[in-house]
């Protein structure tokens, strides 16, 4: 009797796992379908979502080294940086975002009045994981964070697959080895 109850609990546990996996797989398919729809919208708007060159891009590390901290709202030198969009925080007519390249991470400030309505609408539609190029002057926020005030933004490559959650990240060691590209994107310690 006790053995039967253990077996039935195991069966319940085994059936729950595939259901959860199917749910996350459906969620993944839904996210990918949304991103494919965004690619279609971009193409209809005359924007090529893949395969751009972005000449003159500097590394984040070189921008951090060369940018002298501007004081009292002054702007530093104009820089051109390309990287993967890692975070986006919208606040009405302005957006703060983070991009990351192989040398580090830097914050962006995108203002609607600075880049115009069309470019701002395009930036709002960008997803985490998309690769973008930006141009603009540097400044230091009140919190002491070096930031680029974006004057121009170019979509270099659209990401069709979503990145793993930031909070949980890639915890499974086997998955980190199988999907090394994700490990390199998400974990700075992997380099």
Regions found by a protein language model. Name each.
Residues 1-191:
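Class II aminoacyl-tRNA synthetase catalytic cores and aaRS-like
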